[in-house]
């Protein structure tokens, strides 16, 4: 009707609404939604035009922030599993955690996770205060992608062959970390968006 964006809520079993099961990286239940000649009544319309655009932007921002916190939890767990494993796994009669190279890589994971934690808290606190958090959420997503990538690789490296064994749960966290890294835009994409905001004087400008 020329109103631009429209946000609607449809019954799952409405005529023309088709959900197809998808096989995704995380093995979680996800579906592809197809709408075919669906009739939308006035009672199903939640927002139109500018209000719809604002609602969609808010949902996208909150979803990205939630994804970042999920990435934080998965990164933290993978790091702690690695710390526990290297403290128990012995080589040359001592735990491999006592080797300097192992300790340094694990320490880098800890630093990464804490940096991601702080960025997540900053983004979420601004969302909770109801102020513009677009820059902070984008920064958190950059950290979420990069940290998840580095922690996943380090965890697999320090676990050796054990890390890819399906009987050991680390692989589950690594699939989450990879999935979250690419979901809703890679680090490169979000960095480019931040760069555009800076160039336009919309970010980090007094």
List the predicted regions and their residue ranges.
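FAD-binding core of flavoproteins
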Residues: 1-80, 201-206
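Alpha-helical interface subdomain recognition
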Residues: 58-206
